[in-house]
């Protein structure tokens, strides 16, 4: 997955205009968009990651990093402005640090254990600048200097700020301000002479001098082709040149002095596996030092390994089943020289200096060889010191039949002593693939010392913290200056040079009274001039000069509407649709809106499931985790069809038994006796004596067909407990098992009165109608006052127990939501429910409904049994009263 980082020059010099009429910054923005369009033609561009860095100070210069998406990248690119200095060196260091942010965490660099070309993160930095002088706060610089100190942990392990899979390319804009008279000839794009060119060469890239729009497009196409997966290596010749050419003659031109192919700084292509899409390798490139187990630290390595090649022709060694790595070299003078020799069957061994323990040049770890078709040069990477190992392995498989004798083991053990310890792991894996897993002892120590491993782990943790900090700081806007500090333009003169110096002396000595000091606000030390805040809209209703000329008529209409409106409404400074108008581009930017809203308060109930943000449809939820809100969805369709219209709203309970209570069926002609509470199954019925007599309510006959819920509510309000005398106290500790004598007496009075289906709100009206029929006006007024007293008493009792029931309901619902099957607390809380029987029955039905929503089957069955026990007790009381 290539990383494409664009470093755009946002200094003030980018505001200059070319002959096309556009500024350099606009040309740079267009170049980035053109590059992305050209890159999108390649199917491999799906995994590209784009980053954007400018010349602003850290962290404001990082516009798009590791977490920002493509939309954020394009938005930040369009909003760039050319202001500030040309701090190109600091911005380049910021770009490299941004790319190296996660390398210690992922372990790509593999410090101290060899360089693995197949562990890479290919990155290309495209810098677009105007090539002007490098200006900083300290002055103008002629050379490009990158800061040596870096806040990134582990930066001391590498000498350079970049890595071997990171390359820098620069587009230096040299477009003239006037149109060229002569037509330019199509030639190769030249290197630029700006200070950034040297930095490009060091990283393995190059610079382009852009003098026209045609050359710019040509450079962009060339850059797209440069996106290759690979690492940069320094190839240097070791030893004498090859003396003989293919025709047997020496080349006098090439034999004199240093040639370009003697030292090349080029890329080797690391091709990804077609099946997995990830490069696969077996052998590392050796380190330039011999690892010491007693060393507490690691020596810093160079970004690009120095690989020496010897011009000695040798036969390429390969044996069966031994894995090797093959990398193609980028075209260079070295590859051209090797191909011109036309010797595809010979190779040149390669070394890494100081990689061996006792040899300065080191032992060969591979070789350079031209392809059979003579169209490219490949680097073959084999085990370290392969000229010794491969013959031993060949003898083991062919002569000893995979059974090593003692005579064979002695040279093999000597080879292991000359091999760097970090090759033990890859060699064990290769021998396992070849069928000899037990050839090397498991007791061999390889790797790094304990102190070095601890040091690398500590650096990895610090790098993770720094990575989170940098990623969190990306996207912050540069703090705007609210004022301009005023500085004195001239230095203050000494008091001795002032014209009134003598008078000042007399004032000091007291000969002359002191004059009041004249304060000049322009010379005040902390004087500042406020700047206009662009985020605050001008209050046009305060200052008429803030109204744009094109909006005068609209503003006049709005002022007239505010004047004619009622004073109760608020004055509006803008239209209603204008307050909610937003560009279409920003309508879907929901994440940006969430960043600016304040953090929500903590939940009052931690056990309550949190509602996730569903942008778009607020009712869009995952069906797997959605709670059933309607009880009908929990019952099968046959049960819904067989539902009777006279039954109560108790849907949603599985295996539902028919309820035998007459209170929950259609209203009978003879009212039933109502009890207060039943504690549970098999509880004895205790009778409490009530000391006061109960007044009998006036019988009212109504022939109306009402639903069961209305009937239950009316029965609740018409309970006999509402007519108890003042000295009767209904305590909170009543259980469902108590059945007072007041209920028995009430049943007799209700039976005598006939139908008891009336509402307490209609009590006064009914009594008034009765008295009107009898013609007794005084009795009418007396009964009306009595009814008003009873209604007031009922309202007071309702307020007393309803508040307690609300608290109990919240506690019970909280217990229902908890996981597990411990429901003892729920039944304990149900005993504390206050109110008459119907209030408690409705409360219990609501609890069953909530248990149905959360699919608490065991709790539903227990609550149903609890409810049936209440109905059974009630029927027993009704039977006794009828007898």
UniProtKB/Swiss-Prot annotation:
The keyword Nucleus applies. One of its GO terms (cellular component) is integrator complex. Residues 3-227 form the VWFA domain. Pfam families: Beta-barrel_INTS6 (PF25462), INT_SG_DDX_CT_C (PF15300), VWA_2 (PF13519). Keywords: Chromosome, Nucleus. The keyword Nucleus applies. SUPFAM superfamilies: vWA-like. GO terms for biological process: protein localization to chromatin; RNA polymerase II transcription initiation surveillance; snRNA 3'-end processing. A motif (Inhibitory loop) lies at residues 626-633. GO terms for molecular function: protein-macromolecule adaptor activity. It is found in: Nucleus; Chromosome. The inhibitory loop acts as a regulator of protein phosphatase 2A (PP2A) activity: Asp-629 and Glu-630 residues mimic phosphoserine and phosphothreonine residues and bind to the PP2A catalytic subunit PPP2CA active site to block substrate-binding. Belongs to the Integrator subunit 6 family. Component of the integrator complex, a multiprotein complex that terminates RNA polymerase II (Pol II) transcription in the promoter-proximal region of genes. Component of the Integrator complex, composed of core subunits INTS1, INTS2, INTS3, INTS4, INTS5, INTS6, INTS7, INTS8, INTS9/RC74, INTS10, INTS11/CPSF3L, INTS12, INTS13, INTS14 and INTS15. The core complex associates with protein phosphatase 2A subunits PPP2CA and PPP2R1A, to form the Integrator-PP2A (INTAC) complex. This is Integrator complex subunit 6-B. It comes from Xenopus laevis (African clawed frog). The lineage of its organism: Eukaryota, Metazoa, Chordata, Craniata, Vertebrata. The gene is ints6-b.
